[in-house]
Curated annotation (Swiss-Prot):
The protein, known as: 2-oxoacid:ferredoxin oxidoreductase 1, subunit alpha
Gene Ontology MF terms in the entry: 2-oxobutyrate synthase activity; 2-oxoglutarate synthase activity; pyruvate synthase activity
Domain notes: The Tyr-Pro-Ile-Thr-Pro (YPITP) motif is important for the turnover of the reaction, presumably through its flexibility and mobility.
Keyword terms, alphabetized: Oxidoreductase, Pyruvate
Species of origin: Sulfurisphaera tokodaii (strain DSM 16993 / JCM 10545 / NBRC 100140 / 7) (Sulfolobus tokodaii)
């Protein structure tokens, strides 16, 4: 069973909260959910929507086609009516609204919709869009949201303005009734979201007054499987991973979609801290600093790391561009700092609230000169949690910056994660070569066989840090022999990491290893491809790359042998993964499925693309799904 549900309305009217309540309630009934929220770079007023896929087994993707659409305004109907295939819940008050009256809609999109409706013989109003949907076997459910909101206001004896947002509860209540699930799960989800009695009572009345508007359609039954599951988004997964992994300092400058991670850490600062030297535990807090800009943010994190605490920062493309100067300083001084890089659409400001995978090559080679950096890329929320910890361990073990890539899709999507996938029993801190103190002979940049020097914290020994090339003590040096040796010392750490980190842990492989088709991907498209692999008849081996530096070249090269087609699936124009594969293995990728319109890969559009590539032999397919 797989069902697609979408809720949409004006940004700032509680769409995200309503979707989370609905998702929580469905998950509580035992179902798996994958959800993604899309929103404009606008505080209030523009179109926002949340897509949820509900299934009785693990699900990792959404589709373009919608089973149930919940709309509150005219724009949501106009934006999504074409994709609805079963039920469309709409606001009765907007039926006569003309598309030209929707000022918030992109003019290009409005013209396309007007042209479509006109050619199909319908008027360019909400009514016309609804008639088209009805003619295509969609069940229409008109709702008088204002009437229910007024009824609740009268019953609660509060102004109508107070009950405005119960309209969202009406929409999700009707949806929940259509599913046929026990309404008590919905009430519990509402009460866990709202803490004030007034709002709890208001919303419970809204549930009561709207529950009988429709009859059950899907007749879902609560799952009998008793399993511990988490329902969380990518920002939260990374934040919890950092807290669990021992971060004690987090700096940031507000930027979408990275800020939510730091806000979560700030709200959960109280932790049990462990002394890195003695292992003693005591209560403490995580320091979270909102810096004046991104360069200050990374410099603060670097300074904190030098004192011995696990330190990190979080940013997105424009912010990372500003951090690069500090990144180079950290590379020169072998500072174990972690940067969580939330990828959004560029260049420049680009698409601030939309997704992309265009920043892949950039972080691997960011900075002037050459210095080692480890680059990880998470593919789902469980990986995002574990990779946040892995990044901290790698940074300290190899005394080098680590960049953790998380796309906007992963950051702002939600899923139900089985507890065991987090593998908490396998997670532990690895702090590398730490010395409690150093005498006069201590050399912070001592030459060693593996390039990794014993690390003392500030205040524990005499040491010098500078952006210039330096000798073992840290003093500035332009000596030719020292320059060669110190440069090699730094770069050798990446070679050591390449030898020590098993290539099998830097990738994940799914499907039939003997397939003639190999698909190479990374990040969020992995989940879409896994769903296709598990539920469709496509024949391919799926290779997910989880670490791009050091690149798992030997394993990737071996997996490419004997294939008819080697296909990359990624969210950028240049097929950057194929460029890296060619660079590291010397082998060519034969086909690419690409997308750069700012929206995530959707299962149905990707299935169509795979047919074009695998069966029809197209070399390059560009996708443009989403709204």
């Amino acid at each position: 069973m797989r069902l697609s549900w979408v809720i949409g309305g004006a940004q700032g009217t509680g769409i995200d909260t309503a979707a989370n309540i609905f998702g929580n309630a469905v998950a509580s009934a035992g179902y798996y959910i994958y959800g993604n929220r899309e929103y404009y770079s606008n505080i209030k007023g523009r179109h926002s929507y949340f897509s949820l896929t509900i299934s009785d087994k693990r699900v990792r993707s959404n589709t373009q086609k919608i089973d149930i659409l919940v709309s509150f305004d005219a724009e949501t109907v106009f934006q999504h009516f074409y994709d609805v295939k079963d039920i469309l819940i709409y606001n009765k008050a907007v039926e006569t609204t003309k598309i030209d009256a929707v000022q918030s809609m992109e003019p290009e999109l409005a013209e396309r919709i007007k042209d479509f409706l006109t050619k199909q013989g319908y008027e360019t109003t909400v009514k016309g869009a609804l008639e088209y949907a009805s003619k295509n076997n969609v069940t229409l459910i008109p709702v008088n949201y204002d009437e229910i909101a007024k009824k609740v206001a009268d019953e609660m004896k509060v102004p109508l303005s107070v009950t405005e947002r119960v309209k969202n509860i009406v929409g999700i209540t009707i949806s929940y009734k259509l599913l046929g699930l026990d309404v008590n799960y919905l009430i519990e989800a509402i009460n866990s979201t709202f803490k004030q009695d007034l709002y709890r009572k208001m919303n419970e009345l809204a549930v009561k007054d709207s529950y009988d508007i429709v009859e059950s359609r899907y007749n879902l039954k609560p799952s009998s499987k008793e399993r511990r599951r988490f329902w969380l988004d990518g920002n939260t997964a990374v934040a919890i991973g950092k807290i669990y992994g021992g971060v004690r300092f987090q700096s940031y400058y507000p930027i979408t979609p990275a800020s939510d991670e730091s806000v979560y850490i700030e709200a959960h600062q109280d932790v049990l801290m462990e002394d890195p030297i003695t292992g003693d535990k005591k209560k403490g807090t995580i320091v979270v600093v909102q810096a004046e800009d991104e360069l200050a943010a990374i410099n603060m994190a670097i300074g904190a790391a030098l004192t011995g605490v696990r330190a990190a920062t979080a940013t997105s493309g424009p912010g990372f561009s500003l951090m690069v100067e500090g990144l180079g300083w950290a590379g020169m001084n072998e500072v174990p700092v972690v940067i969580t890089y939330y990828i959004r659409g560029g260049p420049s400001t680009g698409l601030p609230t939309r997704t992309a995978q265009s920043d892949l090559i950039f972080p691997i080679f960011a900075g002037h000169g050459e210095f080692p950096k480890i680059v990880l890329a998470s593919g789902d929320h469980a990986e995002a949690f574990k990779d946040a910890i892995w990044a901290l361990n790698l940074a300290e073990k190899y005394q080098t910056p680590v960049i953790h890539l998380v796309e906007k899709t992963l950051a702002n999507s939600y899923s139900t994660i089985p507890y065991e996938e987090l593998e908490l029993d396998k997670l532990k801190a690895e702090r590398g070569k730490i010395v409690e103190s150093g005498d006069i002979s201590y050399k912070r940049f001592k030459f060693t066989e593996d390039g990794i020097s014993p690390r003392a914290f500030l205040g524990k020994a005499t040491m010098y840090y500078t952006g210039d090339e330096h000798n073992e003590e840290g003093h500035i040096s332009e000596d030719v022999v020292n320059r060669t040796m110190m440069y090699e010392k730094r770069m050798k750490k990446l070679e050591v990491a390449d030898k020590e980190i098993p290539e099998e842990s830097r990738v994940k492989i799914y499907g039939d290893l003997n397939s003639r088709n190999l698909i190479i991907t990374w990040g969020s498209p992995t989940g879409v491809l896994r769903d296709i692999l598990e539920e469709s008849n496509f024949d391919f081996t799926l290779l997910q790359i989880r670490m791009f530096s050091p690149f798992p070249k030997n394993l990737v090269s071996k997996l490419m042998e004997g294939r008819d087609k080697i296909i990359t699936v990624e969210g950028n124009y240049l097929a950057q993964t194929s460029l890296l594969v060619k660079m590291y293995t010397g082998k060519d990728v034969t086909n690419s499925i690409l997308k750069w319109n700012g929206r995530p890969f959707l299962r149905d559009e990707l299935e169509e693309a795979l047919i074009k590539v695998i069966k029809d032999g197209e070399k390059r397919v560009v996708l443009n799904g989403g709204i």
